[in-house]
Amino acid sequence: MFIILKRNILINMSFLLNLGELGTFFADEIENLENFTNWISSDFINFINAIVNDIKNIASFLGQAISDIPTFMVNIATNFLTILQNFVQTAISTIQGFVSWFEQQIVGAFEFLSSIASDFINSAYSFFQNVANVFAQIISGVISDFLNFFGANMKHISNAISQLSQFLSPFIAPITIGKFLPVIVDKLAEILPEIEIDLAPVGLGGKIPIKFGEIIKAFAETSVDFLNEIRTELATTLKEFIKEPFISDFKISAREIFNEIGLGDLPFADPPFQLIGRWVAVRSFDEVKDHLRETILLTGYPAWFTNAYLESPVNDFVPKNPLFRPVGIRDLITGSQYGILNISDLEKYAYNNLITPKTAKLMYQNQTARLLQRAVEQGIRQFVITPQKAYEEIISNINLTGKELFLKTFTLEYEYAVQRIVRQFLRSLLSRALSNFGKPYLDFKYLDNTIAKLFKDLGYPEEVRTVFDTMITQSQLIDTNQLLLRQLQQIVKLGIFNEKKIKEELKANKFNEQVALQILESELQFAQLQNTLKEYQFKLKSFLISPKDVEKDLKHLGFDSAIISALIYENQVEQLIKFQLTNIESLAKKGYLSLDEIKKQFKAIGIIKEYEDAFINFINQELQISAFLTILKSQLRQFQIDPKVAEAELKKLNINEYLSNQIIQEEYNINIAKLHLSVLETIAKTLYYDQQQLSGELEKIIKDKTALELYIKKFYYEYIYPKIVNYHVQLARHGILSDISKLPKEVIDYEIKPALLTYQTTLEIEYIKESLKDLEIKPTDAINELEKLGMQKDIAQLIVNTYIPTFYNVHTIIQNIIEGQLYKVGKVPINLGNAESELRKLGIPDSQIKILLDQYSTTFGLDIWRKHLPSISIIENAIKYNYLDQKLIEYSFIPSELLNLYINYYQHLLVGQEVQSFKSEYITALIYNYQNLQLENLLKQYGINEALLSVIKLFAQVRKIVLGLQELYLTPTKALSISEYVSNPQQLLQKVFTEFQIPQELQNTYFEYARNRRVSRYVNEIITTINLLFEKHKIDLGTAQSYLQQLKKYGLTDEEIQLIILNWQLRSAY
């Protein structure tokens, strides 16, 4: 900046006359510096934060400090300008000739001294920087040794000490330089010389001293303070950073020791009361009260303070325990408004919210006033209530509470709502009245009275009524004149035009006579010409007039030639051509005209060749299709062609699907249906069809309902009816009497009723058998019932003896006796109570009751005994935990030989499971070349033989190779990344893509991507250079744009070029 300032002084010394403008001199440099520092304060800070969270404080401080660099540089410029301005103002006030003398005499000396000072400062700073770097290396070594020795015994951070030392080393040199910098500046200021400017040559007398040291200090003061702040903050943060891992390691180790010796609740730090509150909120206060007491006592706070946190809360709005949330003033106000609380409670509890009763009352009145305000505002907006009345309603009711308050509020809202609805109806009537004004069928006097009444009911201001009356007047005038003009136009269209009468009418209704009369005259002329055209159109269509006569007459009337030609063509020529074409088409379709004759007649009419060719092609197709269809129909009628083949032939000719279906239906389907019906009658005589099948088959053939019904009845009575009778007989044999009313009486008496009686008798006998089994009937009663059915007595007695049940189970009794001896079951105390009498009530024979009771009691006792015998899982747990009691073994009923064998097996199994669990871990160890012979011997001992162990080792070797290939083998993605750093990327990518069989099109895409990615940095630098050249006006926009176009082959798109150019244009306007 000193060199730039010197150059500007040499170019134009006139700036000394207006030194205040020098403040803009640094604008460009400061702007560039701001852009740089903005990047530093955003992207660079984000980068620092992403690298390591431990220096967050440093990064934050650096970001804030660096962001102040623009202000710092402006301060430097301002200080320099202040010194220079004071000096110049002193000299310029004496004589203007000083400028010329200063330019000739001093500039050279200033340049010389500045050059010497600059070289000296740079050399001095380099010397001090080297000294600082030496000290930094020494300090870095000391810190590294200290950390390594001190952290060797820290088990949690010992492995990270070397990384910690490497992380701290880069920060030592900046801190050392920052420490030396203030001394460097002071020493430089003392060393730099002081010169004097003698003013005698210009006749002023005296000397002006210039102290370079002071100038250096003026420039360096801000930067030294700034760097001191950075150094201090950096050193403080690094000290905390170094200290924190050791403190944390010590706390973790101490915490583990305290937990192991039972002092886990002894805290190292007291939690804040906010955290205590959240902790208590998710737990029960009574549950954690004792622990809370110990924690609070650790704080050392006085008893009046801590006792409040330990006191049980009061079930009131003021709980007297700070951990419990008291009621808020707004909740109290709301409760008072709803009547839940009295207004006196509000004043009482307001004091607890540090609010005086008077203030609380004011807050209540304010909130009540807002509630009432919302209600009365509805009335004001609808002109239902005046502002004065609305204000009085609010003020007079602000002290109401509870029911009185809300009854008042709801009453106001209800009244306003009712009046609002009424006014909506009135406004609707008023709007309709406004839209209907001006209609000649209305009684204006009656309507005016109605409007006046509506305005009175609505209470609108007089100004609204005035505007409304004006709109009514204008509406009347416009509607009346529109109706009148429309009627005059309708009359004129009929050819009636009385000019005098029309003028009088227009004048009487305040029309613009000239314009209105011109409109009506135009309407008359249009009607006359339209009627003339209709006459000529009729004559042309009827061939009553020649085109020449029409053309002559219409030209005389002033019609344009184009309109005349269109009229003649549309109404005569077109009709004549259509008539001729219709006759030619009719004769050609019948084959009465040859192709040459058709062409001759088309040529005479003037038909174009395209239509002629299309017409002849159409006629040929029609004649061909017509002949083909005649032959095809005959073949279908005679069944000489399959309908599918016929359908295919029709499709070849592009015959419409509906027409094809019609031909096949009429010529084939109807005839084949007749033949099918004949065949069906023959089949029905020998094969069985039910009614539904018969109906279905007949419906396929017969579409007439009468014929269909006759055929169905015929087949029904011949084949289906006998089956129906058999069906009802089968149902009766199973006790089902369906609807047989339609069957003849003979069939019912001799076939259905006997079958039903047989079923009923069989069912009653089965019922008696089941009743005997369930003891629901006595044996004597069962015999009597069987005899009533007509059964002989000896057979009835046999049935009864057979079906009386035996309730006890001999096999179960025998099993209970044997198992009782085996399990050594003692007597199980069972109280049978009145079970014997209850069984007797059920009808169980006395001979079975005692046996039955003994059977169930012994079974019950054995079930209890079995349920509690030691199972195999209990024996396994006993082996696992070395508790094999003799009684446990005895009651398990496992033979001793088997038990000893199982104990040995299970113990071996437990050890083997643990040994084999090392298998996957040992494979991982083998991958990293670690072999343990002791573990291999154990594996061999517990199920892993030599062959399987060899397989495990082979698996580890293969896994190691796969792991290496996964890390180092070139996949397409890795090849794309590595291609940026190899000498022949194209060859590398080609080899990898070929190996993975990547499609050629995709290969070309990624070749281009790899190339553009490799050169993208240089492309960005070129774009930046083009940007700088354009901003410095070294190249014009066209040249810059041509350079950008050359970069399109490296991936730059037209959209990106347009955005870059737009950015240049925006920056040029900045």
From Swiss-Prot:
Impact reported for residue 274 to N: In strain: Isolate variant XX
Result after altering residue 371 to I: In strain: Isolate variant XX
Annotated InterPro entries: UBA
Taxonomy, superkingdom: Viruses
Recorded consequence of changing residue 628 to L: In strain: Isolate variant XX
Impact when changing residue 396 to G: In strain: Isolate variant XX
Effect of residue 924 to N: In strain: Isolate variant XX
Effect of residue 837 to P: In strain: Isolate variant XX
Resulting phenotype, residue 479 to Y: In strain: Isolate variant XX
Record note on what altering residue 645 to I does: In strain: Isolate variant XX
Effect of residue 1032 to R: In strain: Isolate variant XX
Outcome, altering residue 884 to P: In strain: Isolate variant XX
The protein's name in its UniProt record: Uncharacterized protein 1070
Organism for this UniProt entry: Sulfolobus islandicus rod-shaped virus 1
